[in-house]
């Protein structure tokens, strides 16, 4: 079975963080490695993450960048076969979201996968449209042959 790592960059995750952690703890497939990379939060983000079993690496806020911080996390999990990136405000829509995301990698032709992002209930019309347009309800498998049709959205 593939070893799965989860990486969540955080900064002052606030009131929603404990709800996120509670919802995550009910997932049917638990990742083997749980890593929060925190950008020096001044609230209880770090202590809550640790209470829910996450390893926490704290970095200076000035060192955060989206790609580099995530790569730093990947480097911290050398034994993970699959890496899942989540954000501190992305609530998983179902209790089997991780399980379903990981299952696609049973097909050795699959190199990357992502879950559907739904708009928050408070999202404005533009944000809601962007999520619904970019993340349709149907599962899709794409290959490099689809590049002419989908461009950057091929992967």
Specify the residue positions occupied by each region the protein language model found.
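Hydrophobic targeting segments
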Residues: 2-8, 23-24, 32-37
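Short, well-formed alpha-helical segments that are part of the catalytic scaffolds
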Residues: 12-26
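Acidic helix N-cap motif at the loop->helix transition within catalytic regions
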Residues: 18, 43-51
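A conserved acidic beta->alpha catalytic loop
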Residues: 38-46, 91
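Glycine-rich, basic loop-to-helix element that forms the pyrophosphate-binding segment
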Residues: 61-78
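Short beta-strand-to-loop acidic/aromatic patch adjacent to the donor-nucleotide binding site
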Residues: 80-91
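Conserved donor NDP-sugar-binding/catalytic core segment of glycosyltransferases
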Residues: 91, 95-128
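Short, flexible, basic/aromatic active-site loop/helix in glycosyltransferases
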Residues: 115, 133-155
């Amino acid at each position: 079975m593939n070893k799965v790592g989860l990486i969540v960059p955080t900064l002052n995750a606030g009131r929603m963080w404990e709800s996120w952690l509670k919802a995550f703890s009910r997932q049917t497939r638990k990742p083997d490695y749980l890593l929060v990379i925190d950008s020096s939060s001044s609230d209880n983000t770090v202590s809550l993450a640790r209470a829910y079993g996450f390893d926490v690496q704290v970095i200076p806020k000035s060192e955060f960048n989206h790609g580099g911080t995530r790569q730093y996390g990947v480097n911290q999990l050398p034994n993970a076969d699959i890496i899942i990136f989540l954000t501190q405000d992305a609530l998983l829509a179902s209790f089997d979201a991780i399980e379903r995301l990981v299952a696609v990698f049973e097909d050795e032709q699959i190199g990357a996968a992502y879950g559907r992002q739904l708009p928050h209930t408070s999202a404005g019309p533009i944000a809601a449209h962007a999520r619904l347009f970019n993340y349709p309800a149907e599962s899709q498998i794409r290959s490099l042959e689809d590049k002419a049709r989908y461009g950057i959205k091929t992967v």
